[in-house]
Amino acid sequence: MSKPKRMQQRVWIIFGFAILIFMGSFYEPAPQNNPPATASNIEQLIEQRQSDVQIEVSGTVTRLLSDDNDGSRHQRFIIELASGQTLLIVHNIDLAPRIDDIREGDEVRVYGEYIWNDKGGLIHWTHHDPANRHPHGWIRHQDRLYQ
């Protein structure tokens, strides 16, 4: 095979790999089929001191806390579930819109990652993951989705 033909083959191979790499950058892993835990499971999570569990809950805002501005900024508030259990919600406002009109007494629905602590726990990752490595979370307040 002549040198120009070999060179042309190499160019096509490199071009093919470049296309594969480009197309692969659009690949998103299949969503995990593990259903999230729900408020009915929260007592079990607390009892077993489990953490890093995706959970979806509904509750009433009982207290608005000051924002945590150390590192990534987080809006914080406490919700009470129908069972009486309270959870701290930690919402990253560098990655998701702030919920400006939230008030004590408002109903919210939250999907995020539960972390156990001795006060009942907290939910964070209530936002999208720009790197697509973690399940996207959200907060629904007054028919608006914050993620």
Segments (PLM) and residue ranges:
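OB-fold and OB-like single-stranded nucleic-acid-recognition modules
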Residues: 4-147
